[in-house]
Swiss-Prot record:
It comes from Aspergillus terreus (strain NIH 2624 / FGSC A1156). The active site is at E150 (proton donor), E261 (nucleophile). SUPFAM superfamilies: (Trans)glycosidases. One of its GO terms (cellular component) is extracellular region. Disulfide bonds: none annotated. Coiled coil: none annotated. GO terms for molecular function: arabinogalactan endo-1,4-beta-galactosidase activity; glucosidase activity. The gene is galA. Its main location: secreted. Glycans are attached at N126. It holds the Pfam family Glyco_hydro_53. Endogalactanase involved in the degradation of plant cell wall polysaccharides, and more particularly of hairy regions of pectin. It catalyses: The enzyme specifically hydrolyzes (1->4)-beta-D-galactosidic linkages in type I arabinogalactans. This is Probable arabinogalactan endo-beta-1,4-galactanase A. The keyword Hydrolase applies.
Length: 349
């Protein structure tokens, strides 16, 4: 057979390794009486709806000692068991706080040291190991663990603020080894997560500084780089800029890269910031969500080392704007609790 005479067939686009959703609020939503419906209008557990539509990984946030128990360890064990039962992997996002951790808030948990870095580093190590050991004791495998959430401005303030990158490095090293030394049969991949994934200069500054010669944090301490990518906070947050940043991150630091938080609105009548120019043709609609997710998936899949995309809180019907100036960023209709057709786009990227 002369293979040269065979017609050239188009290559199928490979799906991303991780097509995920952060559904941390699920148990709270259900306690409030929300019952989700699938695309056929039938009531079904949210994790099963997601799995049926191609989503294969669940991200969930863990707070140390929240005042009302929301997102604590017991909460996360319950949620993770459901994700695993639905056939999905679990990505645990350690906030190292009793509440939200992000670029504007990195409050050290109550009872943890705020004046001695050695003590705090041990607390980070012991807490992280205890969390992972508890998952192991419950026979729940973890696919990946993020040591900190959106830590561009550091973590565990004040000791882990950006006026002391050696402290940041020490805390991250301690967290990483809490995972590595745990009783989990298979060590989860360890992820570092910054916001503004489109901003290569900010990403480069953080990683170059925290990994500087002599740093306690080394490249061997972590496996993955994750970024948040929200198009409604900055006109400079173009897909083109994200593509450049992801490619540079993967090549400069030798890590797989993921977009671990993202959204697109179905309604945004009065955006606080201008949307990026290369997304201006995408409507604020269910079809627009699908288009955005496909384009984003193409950018990540087209990056050497691009591994996945996670949609942040697609079903939080009590918080449809998800902290943005847009009215509704959900993949679920908050009037009917039925998933939108764009859920299939997330599972298909």
């Amino acid at each position: 057979m002369l293979l040269s005479f065979l017609p050239l067939l188009p290559l199928a686009t490979a799906a991303l390794t991780y097509r995920g959703a952060d559904i941390s609020s699920l148990l709270i939503e259900e306690d409030a009486g929300i019952a989700y419906k699938n695309l056929n209008g039938q009531t079904q557990a949210l994790e099963s709806i997601l799995a049926d539509n191609g989503v294969n990984s669940i991200r969930q946030r863990l707070w140390v000692n929240p005042s009302d128990g929301s997102y604590d360890l017991d909460y996360n064990l319950k949620l993770a068991k459901r994700a695993k039962a639905a056939g999905m992997s679990v990505y645990l996002d350690l906030h190292y706080s009793d509440t939200w951790a992000d670029p504007s808030h990195q409050t050290t948990p109550a009872g943890w040291s705020t004046d001695d870095i050695g003590t705090l580093a041990w607390q980070v190590y012991n807490y992280t190991k205890e969390v992972c050991d508890t998952f192991a004791a419950n026979d729940i495998a973890l696919e990946m663990v993020s040591i900190g959430n959106e830590i561009r401005n550091g973590l565990l303030w004040p000791l882990g603020a950006t006026d002391s990158y050696p402290n940041i490095a020490r805390l991250l090293h301690s967290g990483a080894w809490g995972v590595k030394d745990s009783a989990l049969a298979t060590t989860p991949q360890i992820l570092l997560h910054l916001d503004n994934g489109w901003d290569w200069a900010a990403q480069k500054y953080f990683y170059d500084t925290v990994l500087a010669a002599g740093s306690e944090l080394t490249s061997a301490d972590f496996d993955l780089i994750g970024v948040s990518y929200y198009p409604f906070y900055n006109a400079d947050a173009t897909l083109s800029a994200l593509k450049t940043s992801l490619g540079n991150l993967a090549s400069a630091y030798g890590k797989k890269v993921l977009v671990v938080e993202t959204n697109w609105p179905v309604a945004c009548p009065n955006p606080e910031y201008q949307f990026p120019a290369d997304l201006a043709d995408i409507p604020f609609s269910v079809d627009g969500q699908s288009t955005f997710l496909r384009r984003l998936g193409e950018v990540v899949a087209g990056t050497d080392g691009g591994a996945g995309v996670y949609y942040w809180e697609p079903a939080w019907t009590k918080n449809a704007g998800l902290g943005s100036s847009c009215q509704d960023n959900l993949l679920v209709d908050y009037n009917t609790d039925q998933v939108r057709a764009s859920i299939s786009a997330l599972g298909g990227i």
